A protein has these predicted regions:
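Flexible "cap/lid" loop of the alpha/beta hydrolase fold
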Residues: 1-29, 37-38
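Short, surface-exposed alpha-helical segments at coil->helix boundaries
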Residues: 17, 38, 42, 54-55, ...
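Hydrophobic, aromatic-rich cap/lid helix
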Residues: 39, 54-83
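Hydrophobic "lid"/C-terminal helical patch
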Residues: 40, 73-76, 111, 138, ...
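A short, basic/aromatic alpha-helical/loop segment that forms part
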Residues: 63, 79, 101-102, 129-133
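Short alpha-helix in the alpha/beta-hydrolase fold that links the catalytic acid
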Residues: 74, 90, 104-113
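Short beta-strand/loop motif that positions the catalytic acidic residue
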Residues: 88, 94-96, 100
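Catalytic active-site module of serine/aspartate enzymes centered on a nucleophile-bearing elbow/loop
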Residues: 117-155
């Protein structure tokens, strides 16, 4: 589970409303996805992100269909699996960026504590796009995790 939480935002609807307004407000005001991406991506990445990664993420977000983006944002704010989290018994690897404000490390750590078989990692200087910002680090964490899981099954 990379840069995610068991539910969107807190239990306060004001966060959801602010999240939607920040993402859809510029589109409602006439901006296109490319313009929104230039604002949104720098706000969610950490200092570890390279200039090239930043530009690639901006370009990728800029190509998202606006209607699809609106639907994604509307759906995202309804996500809530807190009540089901305890049902996950298989091994889980949780990875957070230390600078991620969308899926904060403290929230992911709490989620890991609520899972029966979880490991939790924080990637220093990474933001919400942790796997793109620090791919070698994330790949090393995942490789070690998969090797541990495989060795337990073989043993």
């Amino acid at each position: 589970l990379i840069a995610t939480t068991p539910a969107f935002g807190g239990r306060d609807d004001s966060f959801r409303q602010a999240f939607v307004a920040a993402r859809l407000g510029p589109l409602d005001a006439g901006a296109d996805m490319a313009t929104l991406a230039q604002q949104a991506i720098p706000a969610i990445i950490g200092p570890a992100a390279s200039a090239e990664m930043r530009q690639l993420a901006i370009a990728a977000m800029g190509r998202i269909d606006e209607t699809a983006f609106r639907q994604i944002v509307s759906c995202l704010v309804t996500f809530n699996r807190r009540a089901d989290q305890h049902r996950i018994s298989q091994p889980c690897c949780l990875i957070a960026g230390s600078h991620d404000t969308n899926s904060p490390a403290r929230v992911m750590a709490k989620m890991a504590d609520g899972l029966a078989n979880a490991t939790f990692h924080i990637v220093d200087q990474a933001g919400h796009l942790v796997n793109s910002e620090c791919p070698e680090t994330v790949n090393a964490i995942l490789t070690a995790f998969f090797n541990r899981v495989e060795n337990k099954q073989d043993g």
